Each structure stands twice: as structure tokens, then as C-alpha cells.
């Protein structure tokens, strides 16, 4: 399944709300993925791998199954760089993701609203900039 098959509200309104709120944080640059906006399949692959590899922090929302998202998470896993994985409260998440998080000793972050995601990312960003590590 592709993320493009996620509910319209999630793909547009919710993602836009999260991205807009994250963009206004200090020291944050949003690396947008091409998605369906254009380019060839190879362009999308190369761009998404570059973004996933380059970013100081990747934020993944995993409540809607997506093969591409899974590939991006695994790419990020191999970089050994920080990532935050979110799922809406009460949503099931594949054991492949929960097992990876357990191995990394990292929590699956639950949220009820876009504001919850932004708050946790901002806390991580602040801790990262201060050099104290990720907040619990």
C-alpha cells in the first residue's frame, strides 16, 4: 500500500498542519519529499534517499501502511542518525517498526493532535541544540 492511499484528511490537512508548525521552529529546515508532485520514479527514489540520509532528524508518522515509508525508515535506521516515529493514539503499528524501536531503545511516540508532534519535535530539537540528547 502507498501513503497516497491514506485518507485525504491525513494527506492534506493533517500533514500540512504538522509541516507548517514545524517550519516556524528555529533552526528547522523541512526537506519535503517529491511524492506525486512530479519527476520520474528514479527522481523520487534518489530525492527521498538523499533527504532521509541528509536530515539531522527524520520524523515519521507510521499509522498508515506504506512500502515507501518503510523503505525510508530502514534507510534512516542504517544511517544511525536520530529519528522520531509517531502513531496516533490507539492505532496499530507493524511489529517490524516496534521491534526496530525496541532494539534502538527508543519509544513509539503517540499523539492525539498535530500539536503533540510539534511539541515533541521541538523538545528534541532544543535538547539536540543544547547537546543533552533526546528527551524521553
What are these model-derived regions, one by one?
Residues 1-136:
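Conserved catalytic or regulatory cores that recognize and/or transform ribose-phosphate-containing ligands
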Amino acid at each position: 500500500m502507498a501513503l497516497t492511499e491514506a485518507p485525504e484528511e491525513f494527506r492534506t490537512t493533517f500533514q500540512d498542519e504538522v509541516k507548517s508548525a514545524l517550519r516556524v521552529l528555529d533552526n528547522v529546515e523541512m526537506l519535503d519529499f517529491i511524492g506525486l508532485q512530479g519527476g520520474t520514479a528514479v527522481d523520487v527514489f534518489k530525492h527521498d534517499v538523499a533527504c532521509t540520509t541528509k536530515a539531522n532528524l527524520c520524523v515519521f508518522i507510521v499509522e498508515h501502511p506504506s512500502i515507501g515509508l518503510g523503505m525510508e525508515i530502514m534507510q534512516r535506521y542504517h544511517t544511525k542518525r536520530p529519528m522520531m516515529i509517531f502513531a496516533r493514539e490507539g492505532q496499530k503499528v507493524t511489529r517490524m517498526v516496534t521491534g526496530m524501536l525496541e532494539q534502538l531503545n527508543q519509544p513509539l511516540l503517540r499523539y492525539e493532535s498535530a500539536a503533540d508532534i510539534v511539541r515533541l519535535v521541538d523538545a528534541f530539537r532544543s535538547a539536540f541544540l543544547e547537546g543533552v540528547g533526546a528527551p524521553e
